[in-house]
Swiss-Prot record:
Residues 1-29, 587-620 are annotated as: Disordered. It is found in: Cytoplasm. Belongs to the UvrB family. A motif (Beta-hairpin) lies at residues 105-128. This is UvrABC system protein B. The UvrABC repair system catalyzes the recognition and processing of DNA lesions. A damage recognition complex composed of 2 UvrA and 2 UvrB subunits scans DNA for abnormalities. Upon binding of the UvrA(2)B(2) complex to a putative damaged site, the DNA wraps around one UvrB monomer. DNA wrap is dependent on ATP binding by UvrB and probably causes local melting of the DNA helix, facilitating insertion of UvrB beta-hairpin between the DNA strands. Then UvrB probes one DNA strand for the presence of a lesion. GO terms for biological process: nucleotide-excision repair; SOS response. SMART domains: DEXDc (SM00487), HELICc (SM00490). Keywords: ATP-binding, Cytoplasm, DNA damage, DNA excision, DNA repair, Excision nuclease, Nucleotide-binding, SOS response. Residues 630-665 form the UVR domain. Residues 39-417 form the Helicase ATP-binding domain. The beta-hairpin motif is involved in DNA binding. Gene3D superfamilies: P-loop containing nucleotide triphosphate hydrolases, UVR domain.
Length: 683
C-alpha cells in the first residue's frame, strides 16, 4: 500500500479496518438481515437484495454488512441530493475510514451539440464546482492508495474518466532527503498539469518563493511546502492554506496529477500521431462525400486541439480523445471510476428501483447527441468512445452487488440469489392501516378525517396534478383548514419552512403531487390521503403507492386512505404488500413483547436565509441602500459556502439565486463568485 502523505486533513490518512461507530446496536430485523447478507456473500453469492421498509434503518444495516466484509465499496445513488445524504451518513458511521464523494462536478452543464434542421452548433458550456472536483480527486486517490474506502457516487461513476494506470504511474513521490533540484520538481509538476501561479494560489497550482515550492493538490485542504537545501529536499510540511501556518512535518508525500486525463509524454506523442492519422482519414471521407464544409470544419477544429496538446498536454474537450490517451481500442468500454477500484469490490445500489433504470438509460442518450457532431465534422469518430458504460458493461465491471430498496424492481428480484427482507423496524412501528373510500366524495370525506385528526398529528395529501393540488388547497382553506401546498417549483428554502411549519402545527395539512421526491419523513404524520388512487400511471403505480403509504409509517397512529372508484392492479398489489408487512410486524411485536413507539425527532431551527426562523439575521428585510445590500450579500455568501461545504447543494443554489437578485436590484455590485452546486440532475 502506497503512502498517502499529508494531503487529507479532513479524514484519516492511515489504513484502518472498516469500523462502524453508531450510538445503537442492530435491532428489529437488522441482526438477521446483516447475518444473512454476510453469509450470502461469503458463500459466493454475487447479487443480493435488501428489501427494507421505510424507517427500518437500511443504511445502518448496509454499514454493519460492510464492517463484516471489509471490502472497498461503491455506493450508487440516483441523484446528487441523495448521494450527499448518504455521504454524510456514512461519514458519521465510519469516522476513522475514507468515505468519499464522487458526483458530476458541474454547477451548470450544456453539452456540445449540433442541430441539423436549423444548422445550429451549440458549444459546450459549463461551470465547474471546485469543491466537488476536489472530492472527485480525493476519491480516486484514496482508491489507489488504501483499502478502507467507501465511495458514494451518482451515475457519474459510469461516465468516462482518465486511465487509472496513467493516473497512478504519473504520481510524484517526494521524500525528505531526496536528491532533486527545484527545477526538476517544477518540471515534474507541469507534467502533472499543475499550473504555476504565485499570486492566486488555488487547487491545482503551485507557487515558488526562493528555495521553497508550495503545492496545492487537487484533493486536499492543505498545501504541501517543499523546502530545498541546494539540490536536496530538506523538509516536507503540511501548511494551512489561509494563514500559512505549519500543520505538521511529514517524511514523504505522494502528489497525484491535477487532471484525471493527464498522460505521460510518451503516451501523448503516440496519441497525437493517432489523432493526426484519423484526421487525415476523416478529411478524405468528407471530401469523397462532397461535404467540403465538414472537411474544413474537422480539419480546423482538430488541428487546433492537436496544437494545444503539443503545447500544454491538454485541450478543451480532451475527453473526446480519451481512447487515444490509453491502451484501449475503439469500441471497448471507457475507463470509469469503477476501474479505480481493486478487484473484488462491493457495489451497493441504493433505491435500486430508480437507480437501475437510470444507469440503463445513460448510453443511448449520449450516443444520439454525438452522432450529429461526428457526421457533421465537429468531432472525430473516436468521440463515441467518450461515453457512459452500457448496462451490460456496468454489470461486467461490478463483481458483488447489493441492491437496496423498499420496493425492488423486477430486475433486482430476477438477478438476486436471495432477497433479504427487513420488515421489522428498530422502533417496532408497524405499517399503517389502509382504507379504500369512493372517489366521488373524496374531498368531503377528507375534510372529515382532517377534522378528526388530533391536534398533535399531521396529514399529507397527494393529488395527481398541480391544478388539482391548488384547487384542493384553496377549498381546504375556505373550509377552515390550516393547509399549505408543496410543488415542484417550491425551492429549498420554502420546503424547509413548510415542513417545519407542519411539524410545529402552524399548518396541519400539506398537499403535494409527488411527495416521494420531497423526502418527507415526518413523525407527526398520522394520515396519508391519496386522491384518485385508481388512475393508473407513474404516480399511482404499485411502487409509488407503497412508497407513499410509507410516509405514515413513522407514527404509531399511522393510517392511509385511498380514494378510488375501482381497485386497480397496482392498488391491490400495494395494499396486499403493505398488509403483509403489517402482519409480520405485529406478530413479531406480540411474540417479543415490543410496544411500537413513534419516532422522536426534535424540530430544530431551520436557520436558513429567507426563513422566518433565521437566527443569524440572514433573512433581513429587503435592504434599502447599497450598503445594506452589500452587508446582506456578505452574510449570504458566508451561509452559501457553509451550505456547499455541508453538501446542501439545493440550499446553496437558492442562496446563490438570492444573491443574484440583490446584485441585479442594486446596480454596481460585483458579480458573485460562481462555485455553488445547482439542484441535481446528472447529465
Amino acid at each position: 500500500m502506497t503512502d498517502t502523505g499529508p494531503l487529507q486533513p479532513d479524514r484519516p490518512d492511515l489504513d484502518r479496518p472498516l469500523s462502524v461507530d453508531a450510538p445503537f446496536e442492530p435491532a428489529g430485523d437488522q441482526p438477521d438481515a446483516i447475518e444473512t447478507l454476510v453469509a450470502g456473500f461469503e458463500s459466493g453469492a454475487e447479487k443480493q437484495t435488501l428489501l427494507g421498509v421505510t424507517g427500518s434503518g437500511k443504511t445502518n444495516t448496509v454499514s454493519w454488512v460492510l464492517e463484516e466484509l471489509q471490502q472497498p465499496t461503491l455506493v450508487l445513488a440516483h441523484n446528487k441530493t441523495l448521494a450527499a445524504q448518504l455521504y454524510e451518513e456514512f461519514r458519521e458511521l465510519f469516522p476513522d475510514n475514507a468515505v468519499e464523494y464522487f458526483v458530476s462536478y458541474y454547477d451548470y452543464y450544456q453539452p456540445e451539440a449540433y442541430v441539423e434542421q436549423t444548422d445550429t452548433y451549440i458549444d459546450k458550456d459549463m461551470s465547474i464546482n471546485e469543491e466537488i472536483e476536489r472530492l472527485r480527486h480525493s476519491a480516486t486517490r484514496s482508491l489507489l492508495t488504501r483499502d478502507d474506502v467507501i465511495v458514494v457516487a451518482s451515475v457519474s461513476a459510469i461516465y468516462g474518466l482518465g486511465d487509472p494506470a496513467n493516473y497512478e504511474e504519473m504520481a510524484l513521490r517526494l521524500e525528505a532527503g531526496d536528491e532533486r533540484s527545484r527545477e526538476d520538481l517544477l518540471s515534474a509538476l507541469v507534467e502533472l498539469n499543475y499550473e504555476r501561479n504565485d499570486v492566486d494560489f488555488q487547487q491545482g497550482t503551485f507557487r515558488v518563493r526562493g528555495d521553497t515550492v508550495e503545492i496545492y493538490p487537487m484533493y486536499g485542504r492543505h498545501a504541501v511546502r517543499v523546502e530545498f537545501w541546494g539540490d536536496e529536499i530538506d523538509r516536507l510540511l503540511k501548511v494551512d492554506i489561509v494563514d500559512g501556518e505549519v500543520v505538521s512535518e511529514e517524511p514523504a508525500t505522494l502528489i497525484h496529477p491535477a487532471e484525471h486525463y493527464s498522460v505521460p509524454d510518451r503516451r501523448l506523442e503516440t496519441a497525437i500521431e493517432e489523432i493526426e492519422g484519423l484526421l487525415e482519414d476523416r478529411i478524405d471521407y468528407f471530401e469523397r462525400q462532397g461535404d467540403l464544409v465538414a472537411a474544413q470544419r474537422i480539419e480546423e477544429r482538430t488541428t487546433f486541439d492537436i496544437e494545444m496538446l503539443q503545447e500544454t498536454g491538454h485541450c478543451s474537450g480532451i475527453e473526446n480523445y480519451s481512447v487515444h490517451m490509453s491502451d484501449r481500442e475503439t469500441g471497448e468500454p471507457p475507463y470509469t471510476l469503477l476501474d479505480y477500484f481493486p478487484d473484488g469490490f462491493l457495489t451497493v445500489i441504493d433505491e435500486s428501483h430508480q437507480t437501475i433504470p437510470q444507469i440503463k438509460g445513460q448510453f443511448e442518450g449520449d450516443r444520439s447527441r454525438k452522432e450529429s457532431l461526428v457526421e457533421n465534422g465537429f468531432r472525430l469518430p473516436t468521440a463515441y468512445d467518450n461515453r457512459p458504460l452500457k448496462f451490460e458493461e456496468f454489470e461486467a465491471k461490478t463483481d458483488r452487488t447489493l441492491y437496496v430498496s423498499a420496493t425492488p424492481g423486477d430486475y433486482e428480484r430476477d438477478h438476486s440469489e436471495q432477497v433479504v427482507e427487513q420488515i421489522v423496524r428498530p422502533t417496532y412501528l408497524v405499517d399503517p392501516d389502509i382504507e379504500v373510500e369512493p372517489a366521488e366524495k373524496q374531498v368531503e370525506d377528507l375534510i372529515e378525517r382532517i377534522q378528526a385528526t388530533p391536534e398533535d398529528e399531521r396529514v399529507l395529501v397527494t393529488t395527481l396534478t398541480k391544478r388539482m393540488a391548488e384547487d384542493l388547497t384553496e377549498y381546504l382553506e375556505n373550509a377552515g383548514v390550516d393547509v399549505a401546498y408543496m410543488h415542484d417549483e417550491t425551492d429549498t428554502l420554502e420546503r424547509h419552512e413548510l415542513v417545519r411549519s407542519l411539524r410545529l402545527g402552524e399548518i396541519q395539512v400539506l398537499v403535494g403531487i409527488n411527495l416521494l421526491r420531497e423526502g418527507l419523513d415526518i413523525p407527526e404524520v398520522s394520515l396519508v390521503a391519496i386522491l384518485d388512487a385508481d388512475q393508473e400511471g407513474f404516480l399511482r403505480s404499485e411502487t409509488t403507492l407503497v412508497q407513499t403509504m410509507g410516509r405514515a409509517a413513522r407514527n404509531v397512529e399511522g393510517s392511509v386512505v385511498l380514494y378510488a372508484d375501482e381497485t386497480t392492479d397496482s392498488m391491490a398489489a400495494a395494499i396486499e404488500e403493505t398488509r403483509r408487512r403489517r402482519e409480520i410486524q405485529r406478530e413479531f411485536n406480540a411474540e417479543h413483547g415490543h410496544e411500537p413507539r413513534t419516532i422522536e425527532k426534535p424540530v430544530s431551527e431551520t436557520n436558513l436565509p429567507g426563513s422566518s426562523t433565521d437566527t443569524d439575521g440572514v433573512a433581513d428585510v429587503a435592504p434599502d441602500t447599497v450598503d445594506e445590500a452589500e452587508q446582506l450579500i456578505e452574510r449570504l455568501e458566508t451561509r452559501m459556502q457553509e451550505a456547499a461545504d455541508n453538501l446542501e447543494f439545493e440550499l446553496a443554489a437558492d442562496i446563490r439565486d438570492r444573491i443574484r437578485e440583490l446584485r441585479e436590484t442594486f446596480d454596481g455590485l460585483e458579480d458573485p463568485n460562481e462555485g455553488v452546486p445547482s439542484p441535481d440532475e446528472e447529465f
